[in-house]
């Protein structure tokens, strides 16, 4: 009988610990999703809130001819040139999904999402809709520390010329 009681108590303790961890990860994900919404809105408004990125943030994307990784100062320069010529519109509300730690497979507060973005060349009026996948990892302060995106960005933008 004592073994059964001890087993029940140990099981209850283990499940309560997991529940607290899950709750913390869920709260982190919710906060990080709010950060993502603010970043995407500021991007569409051509006024990116760069304070939401860590000073050490690393960007990794699929730009033809770009280095494997980009730093925040490089992204700022890319944005400046891009916003001078193009306008963007997000085609639907975002559906943020919880990301996972690639080593453990456990939810970790990171945010991933798929979306369509319409890009219009403001000089000639040509537009293209680009399907994009992005994921963002965050540090303990809730700032983006690792950003990756996948899309056919180079060909899509070239089609607007």
For the regions a language model picked out, list residue spans one by one.
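Sec-dependent signal peptide recognition
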Residues: 2-7
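C-terminal motif of bacterial Sec signal peptides marking the signal peptidase cleavage site
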Residues: 13-16
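C-terminal and inter-domain tail/linker signature
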Residues: 18-161
């Amino acid at each position: 009988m004592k073994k059964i009681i001890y087993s029940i108590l140990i099981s209850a303790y283990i499940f309560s610990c997991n529940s607290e961890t899950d709750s913390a990860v869920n709260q982190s994900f919710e906060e990080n999703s709010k950060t993502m919404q603010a970043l995407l809105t500021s991007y569409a408004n051509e006024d990116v809130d760069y304070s939401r990125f860590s000073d050490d943030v690393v960007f990794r994307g699929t730009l033809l001819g770009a280095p494997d990784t980009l730093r925040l100062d490089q992204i700022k320069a890319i944005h400046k040139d891009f916003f001078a010529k193009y306008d963007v519109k997000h085609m639907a509300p975002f559906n943020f999904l919880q990301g996972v730690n690639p080593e453990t497979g456990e939810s970790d507060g990171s945010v991933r999402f798929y979306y369509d973005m319409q890009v219009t060349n403001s000089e000639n009026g040509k537009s293209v809709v680009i399907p994009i996948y992005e994921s963002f990892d965050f540090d303990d302060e809730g700032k983006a520390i690792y950003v990756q995106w996948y899309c056919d960005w180079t060909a899509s933008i070239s089609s607007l010329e």
